[in-house]
Amino acid sequence: MSEYTNVAEIFGEDVFNDAVMQQRLPKKVYKDLKQTILEGKELSLEMADVIAHEMKEWAIEKGATHYTHWFQPLTGVTAEKHDSFITAPLPNGKVLMSFSGKELIKGEPDASSFPSGGLRATFEARGYTAWDCTSPAFVREDDGGAILCIPTAFCSYTGEALDQKTPLLRSMEAVQEQALRLIRLFGNTTSRKVKPSVGVEQEY
């Protein structure tokens, strides 16, 4: 008889989900991050530094040595730019492992390597990845080791979407804005967020 695996126990074990954040983050930081996720509140760099540190420590505990801003360019497949947590050797022969809030929030891959649909000229090819905190980070393991994957949006330096996720996020924001306006007309004054979802129909 094969060994029994309790799916409920292992489900999400490699995801930096709400349960992990609540356990590892200081209460104030956790509260501010939840407000950012639910209401779009701006997150300070100081708070981002704390989140990045705890995310790094959690990932290292799971064997990760690198992190990547994980995004969906217009190629039809995902893309990653890998960076190491190792920043400098120490005099005692050890190494320093660090990950800052700035590195968590923003990355700068070579946008000229990805299609843009003619949105910009080659000399304007600069692009940025921006952390999407509404999607949880996760650790992915393969033959090369474990890596912390941080879901991000990918935009040009002038704000044009260069990926498949940014238009989706902007559409969800627009739907939420109008849905909240509508439910206010029906007397609902307490709801702060509308979460659109779409799924395949049963007959599909």
Question: What does each model-identified segment do?
Answer:
Residues E3-V15, A19-T68, Q72-S100, I105-F123:
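Histidine/acidic residue-rich metal-binding segments in metalloenzymes
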Residues M1-E3, Q22-Q23, E54, R140-I150:
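Short, functional N-terminal and low-complexity linear motifs
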Residues A125-E203:
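Glycine-rich, acidic/polar active-site loops that bind/position phosphate-bearing ligands
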